[in-house]
């Protein structure tokens, strides 16, 4: 099976879609999120998707998770000639397939436990961002309405922003000058999000750029923690993550 969902004996009333990082797997992501899962076990089930492309282990995976392969990534490695490679839109089509299948599988097995939000890590956080944006643009009718999201140490490429800009400008019939403010606003995601940024993360600059370019300052909360490319480890940081995420969920009435 190329995708995984939570155990069959689901008890929580709602679920979160979990999108792992590059060179990772659902089994590894379960371990990475263990503290969060324990704290939210009464509130959420965690539904894991397996990325479509086999790959080598990602940053920080070895040697800790050497026994939890194989590893998968969301985008195929570049051949070095980007001009002849697939576009972002084409690559997203490959990304959508395992996500859609996982959602259908979950909805079939657990029709009374809706998926209401998402958690993405590293490359998976970039995938989550693109999913949120596409849904906001009225696309992806198969994707459950995402009310809240947590993005952990996002990996960012300007190519993703360029894809979004091109899509928006096409919707405005190339009338860029007269509608500059309007189409710029369409690049901004407007659901409550929590962005976790490790102060020593190699991807920190890109993480900051992603939230600045594509998330509403009124809806996005940024939490920096002492750490690298990982979910926070220190108990006080974990507690802060949990408290902030719960408050976001209450804001959108995902939690009472």
UniProtKB/Swiss-Prot annotation:
<dbReference type="InterPro" id="IPR005645">
    <property type="entry name" value="FSH-like_dom"/>
</dbReference>
<comment type="pathway">
    <text>Polyketide biosynthesis; lovastatin biosynthesis.</text>
</comment>
<protein>
    <recommendedName>
        <fullName>Dihydromonacolin L-[lovastatin nonaketide synthase] thioesterase</fullName>
        <ecNumber>3.1.2.31</ecNumber>
    </recommendedName>
</protein>
<dbReference type="GO" id="GO:0140735">
    <property type="term" value="P:lovastatin biosynthetic process"/>
</dbReference>
<dbReference type="Pfam" id="PF03959">
    <property type="entry name" value="FSH1"/>
</dbReference>
<feature type="active site" description="Charge relay system">
    <location>
        <position position="229"/>
    </location>
</feature>
<comment type="similarity">
    <text>Belongs to the LovG family.</text>
</comment>
<keyword id="KW-0378">Hydrolase</keyword>
<dbReference type="GO" id="GO:0016788">
    <property type="term" value="F:hydrolase activity, acting on ester bonds"/>
</dbReference>
<dbReference type="GO" id="GO:0005634">
    <property type="term" value="C:nucleus"/>
</dbReference>
<comment type="function">
    <text>Esterase; part of the gene cluster that mediates the biosynthesis of lovastatin (also known as mevinolin, mevacor or monacolin K), a hypolipidemic inhibitor of (3S)-hydroxymethylglutaryl-coenzyme A (HMG-CoA) reductase (HMGR). The first step in the biosynthesis of lovastatin is the production of dihydromonacolin L acid by the lovastatin nonaketide synthase lovB and the trans-acting enoyl reductase lovC via condensation of one acetyl-CoA unit and 8 malonyl-CoA units. Dihydromonacolin L acid is released from lovB by the thioesterase lovG.</text>
</comment>
<feature type="active site" description="Charge relay system">
    <location>
        <position position="201"/>
    </location>
</feature>
<comment type="function">
    <text>Esterase that catalyzes the release of covalently bound dihydromonacolin L from LovB during lovastatin biosynthesis.</text>
</comment>
<dbReference type="GO" id="GO:0030639">
    <property type="term" value="P:polyketide biosynthetic process"/>
</dbReference>
<dbReference type="InterPro" id="IPR050593">
    <property type="entry name" value="LovG"/>
</dbReference>
<feature type="active site" description="Charge relay system">
    <location>
        <position position="122"/>
    </location>
</feature>
<dbReference type="GO" id="GO:0005737">
    <property type="term" value="C:cytoplasm"/>
</dbReference>
<dbReference type="InterPro" id="IPR029058">
    <property type="entry name" value="AB_hydrolase_fold"/>
</dbReference>
